[in-house]
Amino acid sequence: MAKVRVHELARELGVDSKTVLAKLNELGEFVKSASSTIEAPVVRRLRESFPADSGGAANGAPAAPKPARAPKPAPKAAPAPPVEEAPAEPAPPAAPEVVAAPEAPVAAPEPPAPSREAEVPEAPAAERPAAQARPATPGPRPAPRAAEKPADTRTPRPGNNPFASSQGMPRPGGQGGPRPGGPRPSGGGGPRPGNNPFAPSQGMPRPGGSGAAGPRPGGTGAAGPRPGGSGQGGSRPSPGMMPGRSAVGRPGAPARGGSGGPGGGRGGPGGGRGGGGGFGGAPGRGGPGGAPGGGGGFSGGGRSGRGGRGGTQGAFGRAGGKPVRARKSRRAKRQEFEQMSAPSIGGVQVPRGDGTTVVRIRRGASLSDFADRIDANPASLVTVLFHLGEMATVTQALDAGTFEALGAELGYVIEIVSPEDEERELLGSFDIDLDAEAAAESDEDLEARPPVVTVMGHVDHGKTRLLDAIRSTDVVAGEAGGITQHIGAYQVHVTHEDADRAVTFLDTPGHEAFTAMRARGADVTDIAILVVAADDGVMPQTIEALNHAQAANVPIVVAVNKVDKEGANPDKVMQQLTEYNLVAEAYGGDTMFVNVSAKNGTGIDELLEAVLLTADAALDLRANPNKDARGVAIEANLDKGRGAVATVLVQSGTLTVGDSIVAGTAYGRVRAMFDENGDNLSEATPSRPVQVLGLTSVPRAGDSFLVAPDDRTARQIADKRDAAERAATLAKRRKRISLEDFTQALEQGKVSTLNLVLKGDVSGAVEALEDALLQLDVGAEVDLRIIHRGVGGITQNDVNLATVDNAIIIGFNVRPDVRVAELADREGVDIRYYSVIYAAIEDVENSLKGMLKPEFEEVQLGTAEVLQVFRSSKFGNIAGSRVRSGLIRRGASARVLRDSVVIGDNLSIGSLRREKDDVTEVRDGFECGIGLGSFNDLREGDVIETFEVREKERAS
């Protein structure tokens, strides 16, 4: 049975809520407010205690007789058959029945008061002897008066009683008529009219007759056993036995007879008899015309027309029947189950794939983007990801591994869009298709373009002087000597086979821009000139430049410089380069070697001719100038007077002043163009390097540029590129490979080659380390590749090369400077430092075999540069230093570097002073005196590096 609120019960009892709350407190039930709910036993106790305390004053008004609303007299009922033949239709025990003549259903309103006073003391002893077996209640139940029958015929206010079987409507089956057999003594077993919450209807007679607590016809009274059942009216049912809505028939319909269980009877002819009532309730009588009989008592009968045990639906005089909420059939439950979606992890419902559904997402996408692809709720994906061990927000950028795990759980195949495809889709959204443009071009549209040449080599081998010598041959420029305005790229004209040919040169000192462009996929170089000094031969940076060019698959022309210098040996250079797969034509190879002297200007024409011959023989250099310009940014800088200045190389089309361009994340309109001499240009054809003014920001080296239809389109493309790069950066999470990552990837079959970059302090150590690593027996499944080795400190070029080829840098007694270390940390390149060759070999071998153990991590504290060395007979040499980065802490481990080579290791800061005061640490920018104990090999310019060694758990 449902709970009832205090204010509803107060309105039903005719008192205010405060009175009910006070009564509840007296009964030991502490309720907070009038809106609180109370249980059914408490309601019953409250109803029993209220009439006893108030003497019916509170309920006198509702019980007042209303002759105007009196029901019609019920027709005479047939003589009552023996009790043993009671029908299965249960008869509810209603209000006390009037025992007057049948023709007087409405009695005078005067008798209720005196008869009530006379009947109250007789109820427990005379009519309810079986009530002694019931547990004691707070107060005796008041006996209903016989003269109040007319008052019971009023209709209750709709919706007031939550326990009534029919809210606000009279029960069908007609009103109870006068009972034959004369008056019967009143009993206390019947509830007070309008106060019983368990009656089928409040304040009105029960349909089909009423059962009272008096003796039943043909029986021995309420105290005796009921026919057909063994229950007696002594034990009160529990609140869980409260019934639902009565299952009586509609008025005028014949009641179906049937054999009931305990307390039930069988139906009579024409109109079924009600079931025998518990608690002394007399069986109801069916009215003529098939009106159903009243419901049964405590042991109420089963539903009419159905045999079997009597249910608990007839508790407290309520007719037995089907509950209000019918139980669903198996078919209905099955249909609901089939219509439901199968819940995913955590009880959330998300669309699931069939294991082959491909979902393409961009780099750095968020859960919201993935939810849009599969039409799911992003919050549900957060829950699924949480159960997979990953915590992420809806808008957080995720890496590819997280999306793959999520897709595998939901039945989707995740495909991460490559940067090239992402760029293609981005431009396609603006109706720009570069591939379609290239495919639509015919041979008639293509014209020859100048080759783009990059000059590389050792910085001391005359590369800059060679560029100046080539620059001086530019007769069109009309100047001889140095470069007026060096922009990193320029174009010269030479005469080749009686034709004027142009050659574009890119100046990449340190070949940093070349590596950056190759890392971003901007391979704009057609030919590389490798400059080697004839006296020095092949140097470490020469090999480094050679590795860069070979990795980019660029034809190489070797320029042997300084041939006029004493001790020059060009043949030695050709022999040395043969070891690096550069075989000269004189030795039967295909690489052109040209002897030049940049100082004297000899061999320059032969070098340019060799470049043009290589371009004509090995390359097809053609482009379409009759379209919008496409190209790449070579370099850019921010000028105070002119703003962002970008040097761009046009690869196809023609760039004109006034075009709207977008270069990477920068965009703008071309306000002016200049050549390498500072002259204004109105247009730039393919392979022409120019300086462009008018961009909103500075593009990066290697960013591609194109001409957009208008400024608005250029701005939108730049904004979308910026958003995509920012999301990809957030999702990157240092995904560069390390030794631990390689071990895990090797177990999953994702990596079969380990790339290494070896750097050492001496060539012998590097060669020994390389030979030992290449001799490792790790099986045929794994390949160890050393892409570069050299002597000297770890440089920015080493980091760039490792970034491109996803390699690991191994430093043997060498360290990077602060700028290179920051670059490696930013790019996620793993750099390992060793001082014992066997430790390096063991780590690499264990990585290949998947047997890495926990390691110790070295954390750099700071560096200091030695400005002056003070010699002391007592303390040894003291390094007067200035802290360049971090801090210098007394007692910390230290090493001494000279020209990026470790000359002293396993040292410690023995003493630290500042202005003659002993201090524990000195921070960045301050000067101090540093003592390294017994180590005295200090010189001006040395770098003292301090660090801590911490134990680091390897990723499992």
Curated annotation (Swiss-Prot):
GO terms for cellular component: cytosol. GTP binds at residues 457-464, 507-511, 561-564. Pfam families: EF-G_D2, GTP_EFTU, IF-2, IF2_N. Residues 597-599 are annotated as: G5. It comes from the Bacteria. Residues 171-192, 206-234, 255-320 have a biased composition (Gly residues). Residues 457-464 are annotated as: G1. Residues 64-95 have a biased composition (Pro residues). Disulfide bonds: none annotated. Residues 96-107, 121-136, 235-254 have a biased composition (Low complexity). It is found in: Cytoplasm. Residues 561-564 are annotated as: G4. Gene3D superfamilies: 1.10.10.2480, P-loop containing nucleotide triphosphate hydrolases, Translation factors, Translation initiation factor IF- 2, domain 3. Residues 146-155 have a biased composition (Basic and acidic residues). Residues 482-486 are annotated as: G2. One of its GO terms (molecular function) is GTP binding. Belongs to the TRAFAC class translation factor GTPase superfamily. Classic translation factor GTPase family. IF-2 subfamily. PANTHER family: TR-TYPE G DOMAIN-CONTAINING PROTEIN (PTHR43381:SF5), TRANSLATION INITIATION FACTOR IF-2-RELATED (PTHR43381). This is Translation initiation factor IF-2. It comes from Beutenbergia cavernae (strain ATCC BAA-8 / DSM 12333 / CCUG 43141 / JCM 11478 / NBRC 16432 / NCIMB 13614 / HKI 0122).
